[in-house]
């Protein structure tokens, strides 16, 4: 905020605060991706997409097939903190289930 001195009828000198508008830019967004491997069952990938990314069965199946055919698929686009949390949750779940499924994030 800028401060300037002003003279008012009631006071000899007063301080007036002026609000400076700040341009806010939207936060950077990140894609959360699943990477294909030869060992993780397709049904497990569908379950991950439903549980952690709130996808319906049909959408989850389409994403899983994209991962299978193209080597990677986008699960969703989120702010950095949410994307990082989802990557950690999915990676931990896959590890605990004994699957090598990889989940990563990259700037959108």
Swiss-Prot record:
One of its GO terms (biological process) is proteolysis. This is ATP-dependent Clp protease adapter protein ClpS. Belongs to the ClpS family. Involved in the modulation of the specificity of the ClpAP-mediated ATP-dependent protein degradation. NCBIfam families: PRK00033.1-5. InterPro entries: ClpS (IPR022935), ClpS_core (IPR003769), Ribosomal_bL12_C/ClpS-like (IPR014719). Binds to the N-terminal domain of the chaperone ClpA. SUPFAM superfamilies: ClpS-like (SSF54736). Pfam families: ClpS.
């Amino acid at each position: 905020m800028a401060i300037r001195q002003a003279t008012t009828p009631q006071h000899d000198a007063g301080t007036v605060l002026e609000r400076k508008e700040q341009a806010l830019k939207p936060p950077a967004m990140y894609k959360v991706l699943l990477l294909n491997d030869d060992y993780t069952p397709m049904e497990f990938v569908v379950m991950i997409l439903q549980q952690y990314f709130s996808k319906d069965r049909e959408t989850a199946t389409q994403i899983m097939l994209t991962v299978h055919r193209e080597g990677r698929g986008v699960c969703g686009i989120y702010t950095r903190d949410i994307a990082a949390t989802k990557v950690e949750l999915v990676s931990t779940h896959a590890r605990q289930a004994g699957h090598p499924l990889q989940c990563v994030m990259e700037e959108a």
